[in-house]
Swiss-Prot record:
Job of this protein: F(1)F(0) ATP synthase produces ATP from ADP in the presence of a proton or sodium gradient. F-type ATPases consist of two structural domains, F(1) containing the extramembraneous catalytic core and F(0) containing the membrane proton channel, linked together by a central stalk and a peripheral stalk. During catalysis, ATP synthesis in the catalytic domain of F(1) is coupled via a rotary mechanism of the central stalk subunits to proton translocation.
Protein name: ATP synthase subunit delta
Similarity comment text for this entry: Belongs to the ATPase delta chain family.
PROSITE patterns: ATPASE_DELTA (PS00389)
GO cellular component terms, A-Z: plasma membrane; proton-transporting ATP synthase complex
Name of the gene this protein is made from: atpH
Listed GO MF terms: proton-transporting ATP synthase activity, rotational mechanism
Pfam families with a match to the protein in the record: OSCP
Organism: Ruthia magnifica subsp. Calyptogena magnifica
Keyword Ion transport attached: yes
Length: 183
């Protein structure tokens, strides 16, 4: 069975739960972190190993997520991971994360930003931008990163017609304008 088909009821259930207390961001972070764990080949082997009890697998995953998220998992989050393990559906976690994000994007509780940079942003830089924008707007934030080598450095963040220009090119243009006014 295709993972998307398996993932859909789980994503819908988590979305309904997140709607109740507006915990979209917390769930998105847990699902994304869980999906990241499953990229690791050793982690996949550990989860697939039949001699390890599911409770032990849950404990390991819980500790790893706690480390990644820098917080304890909620009871609902632990229960959800446990259900995935017990139903042998933990491998659907990346698809669940993707579907959950799609559900969030269809609500008014998400914001999309275009981020233009002079170079390819690292995952850490993208996460920092998302974290900063999330804190500023108090909404789930998604970014679409684009490269424009003319910027030299820095970033431009666009939200519709609103622009936050933190590029070196903008600073040089501003300095040039100031210098031309003084002469």
């Amino acid at each position: 069975m295709e993972l998307v088909v398996i993932a859909k009821p789980y994503a819908n259930a988590i979305f309904e739960l997140a709607q109740q207390d507006k915990s979209y961001l917390q769930w998105k972070m847990v699902l994304d972190a869980g999906a990241q764990l499953l990229i690791d080949e050793q982690m996949c082997k550990f989860i697939a190993f039949p001699n390890v009890l599911k409770q032990d697998k849950l404990s390991v995953i819980k500790e790893l997520l706690k480390s990644i998220l820098a917080r304890e998992l909620s009871g609902h989050e632990v229960t959800f991971i446990g259900i995935l393990l017990n139903n042998n559906r933990i491998n659907a976690l990346p698809s669940i994360a993707t579907l959950f994000e799609s559900l969030i994007n269809t609500t008014n509780d998400a914001k999309m930003f275009n981020v233009i940079s002079a170079y390819q942003l690292s995952e850490l830089e993208k996460k920092q931008i998302v974290r900063d924008l999330t804190n500023q707007y108090n909404k789930v934030v998604n970014i679409d990163a684009v490269i424009d080598k003319d910027l030299v450095g820095g970033v431009i963040i666009k939200d519709g017609d609103k622009v936050i220009d933190m590029s070196i090119k903008a600073r040089v243009n501003e300095l040039e304008l100031r210098l031309s006014k003084t002469h």
